[in-house]
């Protein structure tokens, strides 16, 4: 049986599978996709802690449900940074960063 990490968020508890990152570090696989109860509760709690904002920004794809729910609850819009440039982007802004869960660098792109 896989080792787990117990997560307590927004009054809810989840058991997360621990995934070996390297010989010195594990990460807990926290996948909110499909967990509507946790997404709604976490969005509400995060909004209580957020300073005033005009827009939410999330990375494609796992952050989308949380950003969507935070947008729904707050009435503020959200934008998804895509993993690559798209044909419809007229003035893309590109950043690259090293991801701990994806081998190599990860590109994130938004249109101005």
Where are these regions (language model features)?
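Active-site-facing substrate-recognition patch
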Residues: 1-52
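Short, flexible loop segments at the rims of nucleotide/cofactor-binding pockets, characterized by
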Residues: 32-38, 57, 100-102
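A generic local structural motif
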Residues: 43-45, 65-66, 106-111
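Short glycine-rich phosphate-binding loop at a beta-alpha junction
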Residues: 53-60
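Short, catalytically relevant binding-site loops at active-site mouths
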Residues: 62-65, 85-87
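Short Gly/Thr/Asp-enriched flexible loops that form oxyanion-binding sites at enzyme active sites
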Residues: 65-74
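Short, glycine/charge-rich flexible loops or terminal/linker lids adjacent to PRPP-binding catalytic cores
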Residues: 76-112
């Amino acid at each position: 049986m896989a080792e787990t990490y117990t997560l307590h968020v927004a009054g809810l508890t989840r058991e997360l599978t621990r995934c070996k990152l390297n010989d010195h570090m594990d990460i807990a696989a926290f996948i909110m996709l499909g967990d509507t109860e946790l997404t709604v509760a976490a969005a509400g709690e995060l909004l209580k802690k957020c300073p005033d904002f005009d827009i939410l920004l999330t990375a494609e794809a796992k952050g989308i449900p949380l950003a969507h729910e935070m947008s729904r609850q707050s009435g503020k819009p959200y934008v998804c940074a895509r993993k690559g440039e798209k044909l419809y982007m007229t003035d893309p802004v590109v950043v690259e960063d090293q991801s701990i869960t994806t081998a190599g660098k990860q590109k994130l792109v938004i249109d101005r």
